[in-house]
């Protein structure tokens, strides 16, 4: 193993606890995998396994949408896999069981990039074997929301315990409860309505050390190092 592969493994572990549910009508008339003669090239074989031609937008097994709910958070993780070389596409949000009239922030996990998205989701082209993971978080009625991290490909159902906003005597307080291990370094990306106005003084950390704060128009990136297994980030 090299360092790059080890880092990739860290970002996909541990596996998540999942529960089965209704996924709608499924066509079972075509097998998921077929026998591919060894005489075929790798590229010919991948097209055959996907049961699709080169012009198909959604070959079998290439597009996955997982709706997640945990600790006061709701978000959708979309994974697109290069089972064959894929062109860039625009996916209507209703095809992902999301309300297209709402406002979302998209976050590309592998590129660690965020952008606003409404109506459709833009996905880039993929070479054979490549993968894109994008999180969609509804920000319509929020002034602060976690939209991604670099800890786990689920963005982030592993190190984030809960998220909430409450009204207190100090005003509105945003609270992010976290878990990890000592010396774990994580960058959390948040949508903040007026991120450019945020100062270090209004961010409070317990059990973690804040090592970097980067503010953009409506994006705040906090890089932290865990000092304890359980930690809290608060922002007034």
Task: Specify the residue positions occupied by each region the protein language model found.
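Non-catalytic C-terminal accessory domains or segments of carbohydrate-active enzymes
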Residues: 61, 74-80, 88-90, 107-236
């Amino acid at each position: 193993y090299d360092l790059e592969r080890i880092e990739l493994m860290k970002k996909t572990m541990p596996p998540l606890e999942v529960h089965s549910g209704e996924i709608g009508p499924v066509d079972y008339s075509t097998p998921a995998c077929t026998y591919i003669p060894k005489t075929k090239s790798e590229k010919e074989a991948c097209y055959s396994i996907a049961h699709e031609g080169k012009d198909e937008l959604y070959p079998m097994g290439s597009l996955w949408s997982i709706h997640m709910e945990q600790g006061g958070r709701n978000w959708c993780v979309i994974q697109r896999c290069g089972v064959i070389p894929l062109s860039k596409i625009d996916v209507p949000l209703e095809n992902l069981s999301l309300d297209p009239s709402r406002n979302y922030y998209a976050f590309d996990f592998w590129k660690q990039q965020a952008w606003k998205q409404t109506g459709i989701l833009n996905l880039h082209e993929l070479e054979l074997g490549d993968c894109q993971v994008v999180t969609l978080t509804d920000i319509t009625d929020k002034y602060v929301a976690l939209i991604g991290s670099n800890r786990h490909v689920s963005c982030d159902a592993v190190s984030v315990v809960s998220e909430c906003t409450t009204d207190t005597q100090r005003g509105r307080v945003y609270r992010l409860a976290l878990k990890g291990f000592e010396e774990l370094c994580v960058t959390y990306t948040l949508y903040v309505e007026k991120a450019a106005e945020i100062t270090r003084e209004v961010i409070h950390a317990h059990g973690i050390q804040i090592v970097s704060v980067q503010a953009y128009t409506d994006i705040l990136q906090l890089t932290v190092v865990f000092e304890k297994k359980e930690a809290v980030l608060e922002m007034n």
